[in-house]
């Protein structure tokens, strides 16, 4: 897509309209520190990285905001497998920001006929859903791998959503955000599809009975 320019030139950051962040969660702090003197405060951040930082327990926006100058940011999250988007198959996602103009600009830039973006103003709840769904997906995979049945998996997912919603509220987000694409949608995809790496890891764990017995599957 011409709306997204991929470059390995650090200097290009100073000229971009917005910076799309896709760095792995546990590497985000190190990379952000290395770029902290380069990223202008005028360049908005679009954070697509999902996760919670080990140790600090910070969300990705919190990690970046603790390092770079204060700048508008948006969170891109939803039930999306990158391969299907690349193949032009229909998909929807969430762009969450306290800055409506930024959310609209991102939607216009990367949305399209087959990729629909819905905006909300709850970046905290959106991030919590995207991060904790990974834990729930592993647990759902374990239920499948140990053959505990569909009833057990449905119960696990339902109670897991309720717990994630409470966590989101405790972090300052809104529980209802978890009923949308960045919560229920992402959880449904990740907890039911063998193409989900976390679900596949859980299945492998359940079948092996012990992490030490795993033969190295699709964890990640």
PLM feature spans:
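Short, conserved active-site loop motifs that form the nucleotide-linked donor/cofactor pocket
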Residues: 2-5, 115
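Rossmann-like NAD(P)(H) cofactor-binding subdomain of soluble oxidoreductases
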Residues: 5-90, 106-108
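N-terminal loops that bind phosphate or other acidic moieties
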Residues: 20, 91, 152, 218-219
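A general structural signal for well-ordered alpha-helical segments in protein cores
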Residues: 28, 60-61, 103, 135, ...
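Short, glycine- and charge-enriched coil/turn segments that flank and shape catalytic ligand pockets
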Residues: 36, 40-42, 71, 100-101, ...
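Internal alpha-helical scaffold of NAD(P)-dependent oxidoreductase catalytic cores
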Residues: 38, 63-71, 90-177
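Glycine-rich beta-alpha junction loops
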Residues: 50-52, 77-81, 99, 121-125, ...
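NAD(P)-dependent Rossmann-like dehydrogenase/reductase catalytic/cofactor-binding core
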Residues: 133, 140-144, 169-179, 183-220
């Amino acid at each position: 897509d011409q709306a997204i320019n991929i470059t390995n030139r650090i200097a290009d950051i100073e000229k971009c309209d917005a910076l799309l962040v896709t760095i792995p969660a546990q590497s985000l702090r190190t990379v952000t520190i290395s770029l902290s003197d380069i990223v202008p405060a005028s360049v908005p951040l679009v954070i697509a990285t999902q996760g919670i930082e080990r140790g600090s327990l910070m969300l990705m926006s919190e990690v970046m905001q603790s390092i770079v100058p204060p700048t508008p940011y948006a969170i891109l999250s939803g039930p999306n497998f990158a391969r299907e988007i690349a193949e032009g198959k229909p998909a929807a996602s969430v762009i969450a920001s306290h800055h409506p103009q930024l959310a609209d600009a991102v939607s216009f830039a990367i949305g399209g006929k087959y990729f629909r973006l819905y905006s909300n103003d709850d970046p905290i709840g959106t991030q919590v859903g995207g991060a904790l769904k990974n834990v729930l997906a592993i647990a759902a995979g374990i239920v499948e791998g140990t053959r505990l049945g569909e009833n057990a998996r449905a119960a696990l997912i339902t109670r897991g959503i309720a717990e994630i919603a409470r966590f989101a509220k405790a972090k300052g987000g809104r529980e209802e955000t978890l009923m949308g694409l960045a919560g229920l949608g992402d959880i449904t995809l990740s907890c039911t599809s063998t193409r989900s790496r976390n679900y596949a890891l859980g299945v492998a764990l359940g079948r092996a009975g012990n992490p030490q017995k795993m033969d190295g599957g699709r964890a990640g």
